[in-house]
């Protein structure tokens, strides 16, 4: 999530609006009224030309009681109480226990915890070494999948931290990170991930052994 010039909290991956809307401006430079009617879907497929940029509040209304959310905070340096606004919205929609708030900026996690200590947080990092496990404002760590190590998972979990892994889009990679004992996975293919994890949880040793033999023969 990011914040517009007039303080609206919106759901947008890029800091610049050009790739998805055609407007070559940073999110923090525009007001909500300037962008709320922009076509935010045609870049992906023409059938999505009616898709608009959602606010965080709109997303929470749709998702409440249905799914858990991982909300990444992307501060621009021009924000006005972005973290506090996120915390207030989670409280308003009674979603503090069904969301995790993550960020590359550790200071954003500090602000979230100071606003509402009950909200779960995750520190996004592209490395899995060093003394990360004692960061008090991070309840977990979100690590790039190819850099994850079993020793880091063990160390973090021993310290009471959750492990999130991103972005896992192949069965081979998913099997590897699940085997390390991770707690959560971020993927563009949730159906694949759900089916594979279900299969692993309900299959026997011999099921997995036969599957490996069949793969060797391919």
Predicted feature locations:
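A glycine-centered beta-loop-beta connector
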Residues: 4-9, 177
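C-terminal active-site rim and adjoining tail of enzyme catalytic domains
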Residues: 46-50, 122-218
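Short alpha-helical
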Residues: 4-5, 77-81, 107, 148, ...
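Metal-dependent phosphodiesterase/phospholipase catalytic core, i.e.
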Residues: 8, 13-120, 143, 157-159, ...
């Amino acid at each position: 999530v990011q914040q517009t010039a007039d303080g609206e909290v919106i759901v947008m991956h890029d800091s610049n609006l050009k790739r998805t809307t055609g407007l070559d401006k940073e999110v923090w430079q525009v007001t909500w009224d300037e962008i709320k009617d922009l076509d935010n879907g045609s870049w992906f497929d023409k059938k999505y030309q009616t898709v608009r940029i959602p606010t965080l509040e709109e997303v929470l209304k749709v998702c409440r009681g249905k799914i858990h959310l991982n909300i990444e905070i992307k501060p621009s340096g021009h924000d006005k109480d972005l973290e506090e606004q996120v915390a207030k919205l989670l409280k308003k929609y009674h979603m503090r226990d069904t969301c995790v708030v993550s960020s590359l900026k550790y200071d954003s996690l500090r602000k979230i915890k100071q606003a509402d200590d009950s909200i779960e947080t995750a520190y996004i990092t592209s490395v899995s070494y060093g003394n990360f496990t004692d960061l008090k404002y991070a309840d977990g760590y979100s690590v790039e999948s190819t850099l994850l190590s079993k020793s880091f998972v063990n160390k973090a979990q021993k310290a009471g931290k959750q492990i999130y892994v991103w972005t896992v889009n192949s069965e081979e990679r998913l099997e590897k990170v699940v085997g390390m004992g991770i707690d959560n996975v971020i993927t563009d293919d949730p159906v694949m991930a759900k089916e594979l994890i279900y299969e692993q949880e309900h299959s026997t040793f011999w099921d997995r052994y036969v599957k490996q033999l069949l793969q060797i023969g391919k």
